[in-house]
């Protein structure tokens, strides 16, 4: 059996989860990564996506996050999300609003750097939409 470690998922509004887990899959800025007990220290930004956790009791749970940071140590993992909600509570209209806002930001981009960042963010949101709300 995998060794358990402490995991916390925090948004500005509240603490969404604080539990002993055996595995956390995080949408890191360079791609999805899995944190396990004893993981090498790592701090990374996270992109919009789904954080999946496997609790110490064997149950699994998932949360939708919209950016933030992940701090992984050998003893635990903390995800500080800009915004987060349980996957069962996600509002499809909220995702669509975020996509429309990202499209507007892309249209209003004043430099190539801003345009590139806006394109990446829009793509991440559309990928997330397809992941949690398949056609």
UniProtKB/Swiss-Prot annotation:
Topology with respect to the bilayer: Peripheral membrane protein
GO molecular function, one term: proton-transporting ATP synthase activity, rotational mechanism
Record has Ion transport as a keyword: yes
Annotated compartments: Cell inner membrane
Keywords: ATP synthesis, Cell inner membrane, Cell membrane, CF(1), Hydrogen ion transport, Ion transport, Membrane, Transport
One GO term describing the cellular component: proton-transporting ATP synthase complex
Main function: Produces ATP from ADP in the presence of a proton gradient across the membrane.
Assigned protein family: Belongs to the ATPase epsilon chain family.
NCBIfam families: ATP_synt_epsi, PRK00571.2-4
Subunit-level organization: F-type ATPases have 2 components, CF(1) - the catalytic core - and CF(0) - the membrane proton channel. CF(1) has five subunits: alpha(3), beta(3), gamma(1), delta(1), epsilon(1). CF(0) has three main subunits: a, b and c.
HAMAP family associated with the record: ATP_synth_epsil_bac (MF_00530)
Protein name: ATP synthase epsilon chain
Organism name: Brucella anthropi (strain ATCC 49188 / DSM 6882 / CCUG 24695 / JCM 21032 / LMG 3331 / NBRC 15819 / NCTC 12168 / Alc 37)
Gene assigned in the entry: atpC
